[in-house]
Amino acid sequence: MKKPCRSNFPFAILLIFAISSCSEVKKTVVLSSPDKSFAYSLKTSNDDSDLLYSINFKGVEIVAPSVLGFEFSEKLEVEKVVIGEIVTKSENSSWKPVYGEKKEYLEVYNEVLVDFSGLKYTLRIRAYNEGIAFRYEFKNEAGQINITSEKTEFNLPAEASAWVSSRAQSAITKMKVSEIKEAKERPMLIQYSDALFVAIGEAGLVDFAMMKLINNNPGTGVLTASLEGEVTYDRAFNSPWRFVMAASEPGKILESNYLLLNLNEPNKIEDTSWIKPGKVIREVTLTTIGGMACVDFAARHNLQFVEFDAGWYGNEHDDASDATTITVDPKRSPGPLELKRVINYAKEKGIGVVLYVNHRALEKQIDEVLPLLQSWGVAGIKYGFVNVGPQEWTDWLHEAVRKAADHKLMIDTHDEYRPTGYSRTYPNFMTQEGIRGDEESATNDMVINTIFTRMIAGAGDQTNCYFAERVAEKMGSHTSQMAKAICVYSPWQFVYWYDRPVGSPVKKGRAGGSVPVISEIPDLGFYDALPTVWDDTKVLDGYPGELAVIVRKSGDSWFLGAITGTKEHALSVPLDFLDSGVKYKATIYSHDQSLDTYTKVKIEEIEVTNQSVLEQSILKQNGLAVRFSKI
């Protein structure tokens, strides 16, 4: 790591001077990525009233001159902005996460910290090989600051196509940038041409208001950062990062999504031995018998956790419900539920228990609930229906993650929250929803949209179901469910979401009444063997709505997931990602409608090497899963 240096610009940082009509010297700062693929230019506007930036990728301007800055409740800026002192830094290192999509992440960038006369903040800009990021850093002497809105623009081609959603869990649709009329979620994927894709988003959001993207002048290509409320500080502070990534294929952007982790602080949990990724089964009956059955099933099938969802402490939406008591909601289950008995039984079997707690209880009782659940031996909590958007709730949620870490509790957050990389700093933050998952019965084309947009942000809990009728009726096939479990990354992977194991009680019209029983069929071998975190990840092919082909490595094994959308595909996948000189057994899970089985999953085994090519035809709205094991 290089230390910051003053007035000694690395090769990738260029300072351009221009003489104005008033014989004043104006600066333009140009910062390039280490591989020179990205270049960020910063200058003042013609009348010196605004800061402007632009971004080039491989010689193509992907963000035309765009305004930077904020609006404040009180005027803090002067009429003239001048670029002042510049501090430079370069980084060339890597780091190993507690868990991830890769076992090691590169962190290579050039950086400038630019000061200004006339402004209360500096601008920190980083040029990575994966993209550009910048944030605003407000100084100690700024006093109390109230930000009413953000002015940061992204000036894009008006005719470029973007995949957008209004909410974190709503449908993702494709439209021209010029047609965007309301605030849209981040990250946003934009296609400029057949060989140029751009992603815009936010990283390092901890105690600021969340950003969305809005086109305030429909018909143009100018998107503006739209804050979900005002922001107030009475101390020095930094804004979240705004990032722009680009690549020739959407899969290359997805492969580089660790950029968001790089833009967060390193791990602050000294002892991480208690942080455990794994597969989770939900206990759907809220009964002792059902809990025991789930524990036995988890132990038998290499699952790591059992989760009790809403209802174990009463009606989750009733403020009178007390999350320090075990009081089953009678509308969800007749019980009985001896929860502590199940937790102790699970511990004997090496299985962790996760409990759901709605935000209503957390906001009132979090300082009581966390130590209590720790004393019960609970492994983690699923925070339910958390508030997102305004600064108040952003700050509350991340403080709630930190408080959970103090009690050695892992966290899964539902419903609208999307990650911005905080799991690097607090890796007990295992996963989150903020995704159009199986609860929404998303079709495969929508899932593929999700993979290439939402998953840029990081892990997504999409509640993978398997035996539920909706799989065949609405969601494609059972093999596409398998493929999703590979393609949609989540360190806590919830499987068999709407299902229950043999031994769970059936109560007509109540808990367990219409929930399918998990049959002990060969398909389960796939989920038994499935890891949830990885040593390496490669996106081999894909395009939103049409196709996703992703391979992931864990130890000596590789897993391939392929999902089709609106069209069928004849896959031809070179297996050159496998180790050379080694034979592998490929266990292939494919859809075969002719089979007289409920899931229509055909399982076959073949021998392959890294010289082999996998040839498979996949129907539209379908999928394929393959496990490669060394022989």
Language-model regions: role of each:
Residues 2-11:
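Bacterial N-terminal signal peptides that target proteins for export
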Residues 20-21:
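C-terminal motif of bacterial Sec signal peptides marking the signal peptidase cleavage site
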Residues 26-264, 597:
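N-terminal accessory beta-strand-rich subdomains and adjacent acidic, glycine-rich linkers
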Residues 237-305, 309:
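An acidic-aromatic substrate-binding cleft motif
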Residues 311-477, 481-482:
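Aromatic- and carboxylate-enriched substrate-binding clefts and catalytic-loop regions
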Residues 474-554:
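Glycine-rich, aromatic-lined ligand/substrate-binding cores of catalytic
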Residues 543-580, 624-625:
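Carbohydrate-binding surface patches
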Residues 605-631:
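C-terminal beta-strand-rich structural cap/linker in extracellular carbohydrate-active enzymes
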